[in-house]
Amino acid sequence: MVSSIDVVGYLDNGAENTVVIGAHYDHLGMGLDHNSLDANPEGKIHNGADDNASGTAGVLELARFFAQNQPKEKFNFLFICFSGEELGLFGSKKFCENPTIDFSKVNYMINMDMIGRLNDSTKKLIIYGVGTAPDWVPMIDKIQSDFSIKKDSAGIGPSDQTSFYLKNIPVLHFFTGQHADYHKPSDDINKINFIGEKKVLEYIVKIIEETEKLPKLIFQKTKNPDVGARKYKVTLGLMPDYAFEGKGMHIDDVTKGKPASKAGLQKGDIIIKLGEVNVGNVNDYMKALSTFKKEDTTEIIVVRDGKQIKMNVTF
């Protein structure tokens, strides 16, 4: 058994309620845990500059900002850097099961996971969890920014906000989008958009300032994808484009030597059918993927340059 720790800091403003600001600080180390998407990962350092040094730096910067600015906010702040996220949200789950503060006094939780690769052309910022409190969407729509914001209502997702949502706490998760370096040694500091991350943090500050004008947020459950119920025995070796808003599952990158690459799938293809499942979005794709096992062969249909292409893929 390997033990690890969550790192927690508390800013006491003498307020009734507390805002939690968090990010995971773990990554993939030397590529030995089978989570790497590199073709030959073992022994290669995976620094995880975007995933998730960017979020960890965001926690530290917001802690510095709120500790030094004047006047005091109407909230206390709990800053947390979680361990064990890559292995299954272990750090945030452990904290939520053994909190150091009264959770009935937590107003909401903000999670930052991969906020360091803002695309300067699209300016896409994805915000998950907007359905977890009635005030989130009107507030986000009200705040002026240069971002092209994609809102996702679900409280459950593949990052640490999920642990807090499951404790009936409103959440937001900020994400600048997927990229070809995800879970690879090439996710390094030279590719971080520092100015873009600064803008994301300034936007989060605006969100927090807006919530100061409101009563304690009201939690509401959302319709969530059943990601936790599925078990995956196979992978295609491709990267979904989570910011894609069209019909189908847009491929952001394809890993060389994996089933998708061998079948002829390319970056930019849009998967519209996998096996017997029509794919309208990423969740449909994941649902289809969960039905296969190693050495299965199935048909996959993609749209490429406006034309449908059929091909066979073997897992």
Enumerate the language-model features and the residues they cover.
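His/Asp/Glu-rich mid-to-C-terminal helical/loop segments that flank catalytic regions of hydrolases
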Residues: 57, 64, 68, 180-226
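Terminal peptide-recognition signature
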Residues: 21, 59, 238, 260, ...
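PDZ/PDZ-like groove recognition
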Residues: 222-267
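Soluble metallo-hydrolase cores and metallopeptidase-like ectodomains found primarily
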Residues: 1-47, 61-64, 68-74
